[in-house]
């Protein structure tokens, strides 16, 4: 495309904007008005990228390598995807032809996750396309916001985007993603989950419910594990959502994550009083089959904090002359993958290692006033099994046992030319990350079956003389017991007013 074509499109854009303002489709910037009187914007762009943006970015050499015709610098209309642009003061509202309707947004998301994203997260292409997908999924959410769309399609797309961010958080952007930012990934995950929660609340007021609400409420609770406001939101949920096994499991893990010995600083969570510090049980329960793969990925982000809390809780229990704890014991206790990982972590926080033993005692000075990187845990990765990225993102089933491997997506030839595939390591080995070692298979603890309660003999009727005073009214039926969770109860209807 030439500069002349761009100038023609720019002139047509200005004329089209005047027409939309005159027709009331867009608000007049020179005439004040009420927000409730503004017309709802409905997108009419049927391409993944509007024509004007596609030409503009081609002229300005801003096209990504996934958006051009292979071997040229020209935009491919079937591969270009609308870029995210941060809203700025003075920026004009987009025209309807620059905004994609929900059906096109869903089609764009299918293209990103089924054509560009490889099926195996160990594939180098996973890291190669991660920055592109991070930006384009953000633009998809922006188009939903501009149109004030909170319907079924918006919720389904946000759910898939949230699962993708959790997957990237566990894989640290993919193998070899040196420029990946954990802070930026967490920021977009929080915003996606916040939008989802608002959508669920709005739809409930209209009488609509969604089957995946408990799943994403559980993710949000683990993402804000030490935020009391997140717990308050969960306590106000309807009983059917609150009692869902996924949400109850998240509540259980959240209780085990709490600490009472954190170094308190401004902007960080406060300590929790009367914390049991059941760190060993936390890592054991994360390995349970009923903890889903994505839920374990979010819990993994707190492994370092829980391990520091465990060391601070253990230190006062040992005298200075204690010989130390064997590294093999520390590995089992703190859910690590190898003694090398344990040695590196203990050295980082200031624990001395001597003859294969960790000097955890009263004299140890644990250095927690630093940024501890989140580990890549083979304990978590084992839960994925053979599930593909598409199976995890599109279906998000509760446990890895129900996940089936999806066929590899139809990948464009450009992908294989841009990043050569490396041979995948055997499944018995841990993923080829610098900080992940092949773990020794650990047998998961089996749950002991609970024997059935003995049958109760119905009480015999008392004589008529003993019926005064009259018996109390029958008790309100109790809520169904949710197995393997702590004793959480939803507030009564009177407390929800």
Regions picked out by a protein language model, each given a short descriptive name:
Residues 142-152, 201-209:
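Flexible helix-coil transition and linker loops at the boundaries of alpha-helical arrays
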Residues 106-117, 153-170, 212-222:
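Amphipathic alpha-helical repeat scaffolds of TPR domains
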Residues 124-129, 172-188:
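Short coil/turn connectors between adjacent alpha-helices in alpha-solenoid helical repeat scaffolds
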Residues 1-150:
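N-terminal alpha-helical interaction modules that lie
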Residues 167-174, 228-229:
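Short coil/turn linking the two alpha-helices of tandem helical-hairpin repeats
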Residues 182-345, 354-355:
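Alpha-helical scaffold segments of alpha-solenoid architecture
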Residues 488-495:
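Conserved small/polar residues in nucleotide/adenosyl-binding loops
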Residues 274-430, 444-446:
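Long C-terminal extensions of eukaryotic subunits of large macromolecular complexes
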């Amino acid at each position: 495309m030439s500069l002349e074509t761009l100038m023609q499109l720019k002139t047509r854009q200005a004329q089209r904007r005047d027409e939309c303002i005159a027709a009331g489709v867009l608000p007049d910037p020179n005439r004040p008005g009420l927000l409730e009187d503004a017309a709802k914007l409905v997108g009419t762009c049927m391409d993944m990228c509007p024509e004007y943006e596609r030409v503009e970015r081609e002229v300005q050499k801003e096209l990504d390598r996934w958006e051009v015709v292979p071997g040229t610098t020209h935009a491919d209309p079937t591969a270009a995807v609308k870029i995210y642009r941060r809203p700025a003061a003075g920026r004009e509202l987009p025209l309807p032809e620059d905004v994609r309707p929900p059906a096109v947004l869903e089609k764009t998301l299918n293209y990103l996750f089924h054509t560009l994203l490889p099926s195996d997260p160990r594939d180098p292409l996973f890291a190669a396309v991660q920055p592109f997908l991070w930006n384009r999924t953000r633009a998809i959410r922006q188009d939903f916001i501009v149109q004030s769309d909170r319907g079924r399609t918006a919720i389904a797309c946000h759910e898939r985007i949230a699962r993708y961010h959790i997957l990237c958080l566990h894989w640290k952007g993919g193998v070899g993603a040196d420029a990946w930012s954990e802070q930026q990934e967490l920021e977009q995950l929080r915003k996606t989950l916040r939008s989802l929660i608002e959508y669920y609340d709005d739809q409930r007021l209209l009488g609509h419910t969604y089957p995946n609400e408990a799943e994403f409420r559980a993710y949000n609770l683990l993402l804000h594990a030490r935020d009391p406001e997140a717990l308050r939101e969960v306590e106000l949920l309807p009983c059917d959502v609150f009692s869902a096994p996924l949400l109850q499991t998240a509540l259980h893990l959240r209780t085990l994550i709490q600490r009472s010995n954190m170094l308190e600083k401004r902007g960080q969570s406060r300590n929790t009083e009367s914390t049991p510090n059941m760190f060993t049980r936390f890592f054991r329960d994360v390995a349970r089959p009923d903890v889903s793969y994505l839920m374990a990925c979010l819990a993994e982000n707190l492994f370092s904090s829980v391990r520091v809390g465990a060391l601070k809780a253990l230190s006062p229990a040992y005298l200075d002359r204690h010989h130390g704890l064997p590294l093999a014991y520390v590995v089992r206790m703190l859910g690590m993958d190898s003694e090398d990982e344990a040695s590196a972590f203990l050295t980082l926080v200031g624990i001395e290692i001597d003859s294969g033993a960790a000097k955890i005692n009263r004299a140890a000075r644990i250095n927690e006033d630093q940024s501890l990187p989140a580990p890549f845990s083979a304990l978590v990765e084992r839960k994925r099994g053979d599930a593909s990225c598409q199976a995890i993102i599109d279906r998000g089933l509760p446990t890895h046992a129900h996940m089936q491997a999806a066929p590899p997506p139809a990948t464009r030839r450009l992908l294989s030319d841009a990043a050569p595939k490396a041979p995948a390591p055997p499944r018995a080995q841990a993923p080829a990350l610098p900080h992940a070692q092949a773990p020794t298979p650990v047998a998961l603890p089996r749950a002991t079956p609970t024997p059935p309660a003995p049958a109760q003999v119905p009480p015999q009727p008392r004589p008529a003389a003993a019926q005064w005073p009259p018996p109390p009214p029958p008790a309100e039926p109790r809520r169904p017991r949710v197995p393997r969770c702590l004793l959480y109860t939803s507030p009564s209807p009177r407390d929800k007013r």
